[in-house]
Amino acid sequence: MASQLQVFSPPSVSSSAFCSAKKLKIEPSGWDVSGQSSNDKYYTHSKTLPATQGQASSSHQVANFNLPAYDQGLLLPAPAVEHIVVTAADSSGSAATATFQSSQTLTHRSNVSLLEPYQKCGLKRKSEEVESNGSVQIIEEHPPLMLQNRTVVGAAATTTTVTTKSSSSSGEGDYQLVQHEILCSMTNSYEVLEFLGRGTFGQVAKCWKRSTKEIVAIKILKNHPSYARQGQIEVSILSRLSSENADEYNFVRSYECFQHKNHTCLVFEMLEQNLYDFLKQNKFSPLPLKYIRPILQQVATALMKLKSLGLIHADLKPENIMLVDPVRQPYRVKVIDFGSASHVSKAVCSTYLQSRYYRAPEIILGLPFCEAIDMWSLGCVIAELFLGWPLYPGASEYDQIRYISQTQGLPAEYLLSAGTKTTRFFNRDPNLGYPLWRLKTPEEHELETGIKSKEARKYIFNCLDDMAQVNMSTDLEGTDMLAEKADRREYIDLLKKMLTIDADKRITPLKTLNHQFVTMSHLLDFPHSSHVKSCFQNMEICKRRVHMYDTVSQIKSPFTTHVAPNTSTNLTMSFSNQLNTVHNQASVLASSSTAAAATLSLANSDVSLLNYQSALYPSSAAPVPGVAQQGVSLQPGTTQICTQTDPFQQTFIVCPPAFQTGLQATTKHSGFPVRMDNAVPIVPQAPAAQPLQIQSGVLTQGSCTPLMVATLHPQVATITPQYAVPFTLSCAAGRPALVEQTAAVLQAWPGGTQQILLPSAWQQLPGVALHNSVQPAAVIPEAMGSSQQLADWRNAHSHGNQYSTIMQQPSLLTNHVTLATAQPLNVGVAHVVRQQQSSSLPSKKNKQSAPVSSKSSLEVLPSQVYSLVGSSPLRTTSSYNSLVPVQDQHQPIIIPDTPSPPVSVITIRSDTDEEEDNKYKPNSSSLKARSNVISYVTVNDSPDSDSSLSSPHPTDTLSALRGNSGTLLEGPGRPAADGIGTRTIIVPPLKTQLGDCTVATQASGLLSSKTKPVASVSGQSSGCCITPTGYRAQRGGASAVQPLNLSQNQQSSSASTSQERSSNPAPRRQQAFVAPLSQAPYAFQHGSPLHSTGHPHLAPAPAHLPSQPHLYTYAAPTSAAALGSTSSIAHLFSPQGSSRHAAAYTTHPSTLVHQVPVSVGPSLLTSASVAPAQYQHQFATQSYIGSSRGSTIYTGYPLSPTKISQYSYL
């Protein structure tokens, strides 16, 4: 059938880097483009046709317009025979022509010069629909009867008069922009430089902010009453999002909102190009998976944040995904356009949402919906990137659901029966058997509605699995081709989960981020593939560089909200990795209570979203601005700042003593509002408590580190309120920040004052409120508090890499989570309480029939902390509900049998003279001392401690380590005059799920008995034991084994493991599961797994990272909701040269519980003299490890595992 396209006037084109729009006045009734003829032709590249007409006499020629400064060429890839090109207008014949009284306006969404085949000759991609006279022709409503007056200068088209009011409803309320017009807000003025684009909301202009000389994009909403309500919703959502880190969560940053001539103006950062224009620029060629992956990861991160806030974007499509800077930051994207967004609680099932190509089935069928519709849209987007063509380019909702049903099958019967719009597209025939619903034929639908069905698909798939066969690259071979096929399998698997018709079964953003396609764990089977290395390198863009954010302009924005009301002082902080900067400027906290706003500029170089280590990737020359947002109020007052001059590796904010006195769980704060992103709201445990409340904001730091909550009590005889403050155990610059270091800050603080250290890694649990999770606190004897001043807690760790899990993703919890004390959230919480010896601490463990010593007792919350208990690796217990005496009846270790999640409490009384005779004598009498570590905090015992009970290690191993820098354990030579020591034990309870079989994990080992060591194995662990010499590889037989593989399942060929596990039957119970879902580190070592026999990180060779140019690492994104992801660190602590290693991987279920692991410093390694640079910053444990056993080479990386959501790392 011949088709004709008659153009009545030249097109009006609007274009810029932000977005572009173009209008063509056509007579749309008489043309039809059908791909079903035998002589199919495709649009060709042509710039010679006149701009006023274009006639296609026989087949599919379309006019191409010769417009300067615009790319007119669109070469349609023609090799696919599946695709069918159809018309956007009714092709029923002349009847449709007679019905049209006026010409319509076809508006393309980009600056292409013809009705490109991507839109199927006019198939609309926008959500606006005009369904009259059987034709679907309007892509986007515009005021269109009057063309814009344009001025073309060289290659730049600028707008002099953008819009002319007309009778069209879409033209009502548009603001008439004039070039170089000044838009004024309360605090800034903006000069209009260029028109960027228009939508149903209004228009976007490129403007110049005169005060800062930066380019911004201003969205000018229509003042029509029909847009007023949605404009208010958008402003409120942007106001909420402005309190989050826009760079971290990958959505456009909004600066301010103001009114200009009765039009609402929203000021945004200027972004370069949307994904649709990017596809068009590349002639709609398919995008390789290695480029789709970083885009998917970043958008899924944004959706995860929106889900945690209870927000629905509701218009996710390539046009609303912007490339930030395609040249300097390739494939760095942000999500824009929250004009259709809404809160999930206000979602109405009849609401018309989403652009049609990306519309979820629940919207089409009229079902209740939630934020899962955004995941459907994202699936359609990544499918479009993969195909170069929309997966479901429906010209109408009927075509849309028809395409979906043909490829993925009909929606379930219960969905169709519940849908309010089901009968528009389906017929229910009670005479038929199952299924009860039948999709209407195109003829039936056209007869009922007058809307003719179109075929606009380029690819018609019988199932989504068929997508893996298209667009296969021809330049790959060998392992590269195998890796590409494996990558496609994981991509299709993820795509099917994202395009699940049932929204309740659709994958969530968090699970998407932990899918193997994103974490790339499946690519570890191809270590020598250059294609795989390229994939890892492309994901580097997800590592973000953060520098000082312009908080001044942010404060002026009406979007910026403060936790505290107006105070006399604002203290704006961003953070570095050196605490001495805080020391040098700590006087600001004390002196600026009435001064102007003080700023501690401690900008950090690297904040890794995907947890790349800063040692591996250099900082960018063009860093992305960081965000300092909502704050916490610090009560001004006299301070006694610690005066140590040595730089700590951890960043802390040292708060004055009077700080706690003003802490209330209300918004009535005064003093220093510290602006931060995503801090942890800590809510009081009891009315007597005065905790620190931190609203949502972030203390952005270069690394995301685990938390520890430490509490200091003043020296009073009665119980006092507890002030829980997160302690972080890592630092940003690849250096170990152990509690020994951080606790030394407490040395200079007087004993009778309350001091708090605020770390900089509060982004670990954004949005999670620890309401009643503050458990009974640990008691440090006054002897240590007064004489030692915690001096032994700190070692001189001035070097080394940081071993910590990365937790930087947002929380999934929309509101605060109230946790009862009996059901603690495993957040790695340990309370350290200093009291006088005369004080008594009533504790809940009295209910467990265990007396509490008033002298010194210790309670440790169930936190995922590596417990090093001196020379006795078997003294701690968390996985067993057993009551085993340690010293005598007065010295029990109590594991209370509370409901899951249990609170594992270990109480070890200090040694007193009257208890000397009742203690068990150690088997090794030569061992006189031990050091207990609370997250590597060394606390010395009395000389005749029983810690050597069941210790298979000689005494000289302790002294051998004392000389090493960074050693935690004390030797036996410590005099007995050290006084009473405190034994501090952290017990992490958890269980790990192996496939569908859940087994209890012995996180800290079995309880030791009087005579023999007891080995505990986690999963199939080879059991690296905790000894005074660090972690020691299992030597065999009955060696004491205590794997610290808290959430991993180690695999090894050690046969003694199973022997010990079978020889030590003990009652075991399932502990509270903490799902470590988020991390997935990867390290490549260029070479065969057989090339080396020792662990690459334990080799005494030169530094591993600097000497490995082919080392590519990538860590999966995490979220605070999946904080639990401890490193599988056992194999790092085996002796150097040992041929055994614990290559571990984990199979994690989808259960989500918060958990915070604790980092490991290099001092715990077998040899502290090994250069810390030999170890990767955060996740160096999962490289291909050479082994003397060929059968265990690939145990660390199972071939295409199905449920592995992370690889642990350090």
Curated annotation (Swiss-Prot):
Post-translational modification: Phosphorylated and activated by JNK1. Autophosphorylated.
Positions of crosslink type Glycyl lysine isopeptide (Lys-Gly) (interchain with G-Cter in SUMO): 25, 1203
Residue numbers spanned by region Required for localization to nuclear speckles: 891-998
Keywords of this entry: ATP-binding, Cytoplasm, Isopeptide bond, Kinase, Nucleotide-binding, Nucleus, Phosphoprotein, Serine/threonine-protein kinase, Transcription, Transcription regulation, Transferase, Ubl conjugation
Reaction(s) catalysed by this chain's protein: L-seryl-[protein] + ATP = O-phospho-L-seryl-[protein] + ADP + H(+); L-threonyl-[protein] + ATP = O-phospho-L-threonyl-[protein] + ADP + H(+)
Domain Protein kinase, residue spans: 190-518
Active site, UniProt feature: 315
One cellular-component annotation, GO: cytoplasm
Phosphoprotein listed as a keyword: yes
Residues where ATP binds: 196-204, 219
Group of enzyme by EC: transferase
SMART domains: S_TKc (SM00220)
Subcellular location: Nucleus; Cytoplasm; Nucleus speckle
Record-listed cross-link Glycyl lysine isopeptide (Lys-Gly) (interchain with G-Cter in SUMO2), residues: 25, 120, 124, 991
Region described as Disordered: spans on this chain: 835-856, 938-981, 1046-1069, 1084-1104
Annotated region described as SUMO interaction motifs (SIM), given as residue ranges: 902-926
Low complexity: bias regions: 941-959, 1047-1063, 1095-1104
Motif (Nuclear localization signal 1 (NLS1)): 844-847
Self-association state and partner proteins as the record states: Interacts with Nkx1-2, Nkx2-5, MYB, PARK7, DAXX and p53/TP53. Part of a cytoplasmic complex made of HIPK1, DAB2IP and MAP3K5 in response to TNF. This complex formation promotes MAP3K5-JNK activation and subsequent apoptosis.
Family stated for the protein in its record: Belongs to the protein kinase superfamily. CMGC Ser/Thr protein kinase family. HIPK subfamily.
Protein known as: Homeodomain-interacting protein kinase 1
Species whose genome carries this gene: Mus musculus
Lineage: Eukaryota, Metazoa, Chordata, Craniata, Vertebrata
